[in-house]
Amino acid sequence: MKRHNYSVYMIASKSRALYIGMTDDLERRMFEHKNDMVNGFSKQYRCHRLVYYEAFDDVKRAIDREKQFKRWNREKKDFLIERLNPTWEDLAADWFKRHRYEPEKQVPPLAS
């Protein structure tokens, strides 16, 4: 039987507009948000920074947690984020950087 993984996440803009969502593939979903592939609030307010997330193996628990977060006032959401991520760093900042080949030392040119 395949094990399912679900994530409830909060993403923020530079001005700290906050979007809350739920997905079964957080890496794919963050790629979509970061590249403005998701129409709506997150695209309009440029919410590209993953500032908080929780993982679940049960979809109902994930949906319930997302709904709970959405009912919370802003102060409570900020407190939760800042407890674990006080500077609102992008937790997915390095997920999509391309790897470049960087040799440790230069190879000498071939003699002509």
Q: What are the residue ranges of the model-derived segments?
A:
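Short arginine-rich
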Residues: 68-80
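GIY-YIG nuclease catalytic motif and its immediate N-terminal context
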Residues: 1-38, 43-49, 53, 63-67, ...
